Amino acid sequence: YRRDAEAFLAALEDEAYRHFSGLKPVCDFTVIYERSPDLFTASSVAELDRLYAEARGDEKRRLAYLLAFAVDGYMGAETRQLGDEVANTENRTTITVDGEEIGLRAAPVAMANEPDRARRQRIEEARLAATAEHLNPLLGAQWRRCHELARGLGRKDYLDLYSEVRGIDYMALRAKAETFLHDTAALYERTIDRLARERLGLS
């Protein structure tokens, strides 16, 4: 299983690198998952889940990593076609700003290199509109499917599943992060204002 898992991960990472670096225009995670049909199944995840629940000590920690890997793979396998569709839609979607066509993925780079604030705003608005129109429906379908899969594994939802397999209380983490942001907001604003004046010449 470990050998097959390592080969799968290497192939998946290679596909992701080649596509997102622009070397491969069409993303095809589906074919990689389909080469390993027995690696990630509901029954294998359920069996690992059972073993994890019964284990103690070092064995439980070891199984926690394996269960997390299996759950990640199961989610990816069951949403592989949607994953491809999201990546390929993002790759081929363009926006038009002031008559210039910009790839959706290139929009953040265009914004970072654009000195004119008003044009940066237009790029951002076009990027958000294209994302809402073309990507959000696909991402919504993907996340709904993930919640369904989590419920099929006996959890309330995706958050509940990953809180357990990752050993992280995400709601507690969120509360701590929100408290930190609230407590440091004034300091952040003062620091950014000073740096903007000193280094960027903004007032």
Stretches found by the model and what they are:
Residues Y1-E133, G140, L159, T179:
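N-terminal helix-rich structural modules
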Residues G83, E90, A129-S203:
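Contiguous, non-catalytic segments that form substrate-binding/exosite surfaces or channel walls
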